[in-house]
Amino acid sequence: MNINYWLKKAIKKLSHCENPRYEAEILLSHVLKCTRIAIIINQEIDLSKEQYQKLNNFIYRRSIGEPIAYIIGKKEFWSLSLCVSYKTLIPRPDTEILVEKILSKVNKNFRSILDLGTGSGAIALALASVCSHWNIIGVDNSYSALKIAKINGLKLNLKNVEFFYSNWFSHINEKFHIIVSNPPYIGIKEIQSLKKDIFYEPFNALISKKDGLLDIELIIQKASQYLFDKGWLFIEHGWKQKLKVQYFFKKYNFFCIQSFKDYGGNDRITFGQKK
């Protein structure tokens, strides 16, 4: 069976997906170890038996909802190819906006950044790749996630970032110019309305009590203790949570509070400055 014939079959099996052709080509490029462009211009090439079997297994897994990032074990974020596993959230394109906003606020005096709940290390590594003079720390309460983050750091050869265990601020003993977090912010009542793909991701990195706001408030409440004066706190949150998150920032004495939308036009990021 050649690439063209397999691709047509795969697209039919993935017809319920948002972009079946793109997803089928991603799986092909992973198995054949080539670019999507190479696949497009070489569709008459025959697949080996081993390649055919692996591709069919991948298509089945995708057809029942497993995210492609977990199937191939990687996801691109901020032009970085990151390893991911079932123990880490899959980095989203919308979170790149968080990185952009942090970069817009930094100045020559900023030297230290803390990424709370780092997961695969996406935010910390994206920042480290841009500013080699910063000292960046990523923490997580999952040793499995930290293992993936460390693998990504080594693979990318980024020397100015380190990862270690901390349950939010539990093991933090210093102050930072910037603290950033993409914490769990989905409420328990929202679970049934989620796409089935999301159920493959670690629930403790997704779900938070008090309508998804428990961890967000805890972080905002404690962040001032770990920020230098005039330091910034950046939080990613749910699209209906902007007003509540802004209220928490005001309640815990932050100012210059701003919120920004994601690529879909939904409120997604709020940040404020320590007084």
Swiss-Prot record:
S-adenosyl-L-methionine binds at G117, T118, G119, S120, G121, D140, W168, N182. It catalyses: L-glutaminyl-[peptide chain release factor] + S-adenosyl-L-methionine = N(5)-methyl-L-glutaminyl-[peptide chain release factor] + S-adenosyl-L-homocysteine + H(+). Keywords: Methyltransferase, S-adenosyl-L-methionine, Transferase. Gene3D superfamilies: DNA helicase RuvA subunit, C-terminal domain, Vaccinia Virus protein VP39. Its EC number is 2.1.1.297. It comes from the Bacteria. It is an enzyme of class 2 (transferase). Pfam families: MTS, PrmC_N. GO terms for molecular function: nucleic acid binding; protein-(glutamine-N5) methyltransferase activity; protein-glutamine N-methyltransferase activity. Substrate binds at N182, P183, P184, Y185. GO terms for biological process: methylation. Belongs to the protein N5-glutamine methyltransferase family. PrmC subfamily. NCBIfam families: hemK_fam, RF_mod_PrmC. Methylates the class 1 translation termination release factors RF1/PrfA and RF2/PrfB on the glutamine residue of the universally conserved GGQ motif. This is Release factor glutamine methyltransferase. It comes from Buchnera aphidicola subsp. Schizaphis graminum (strain Sg).
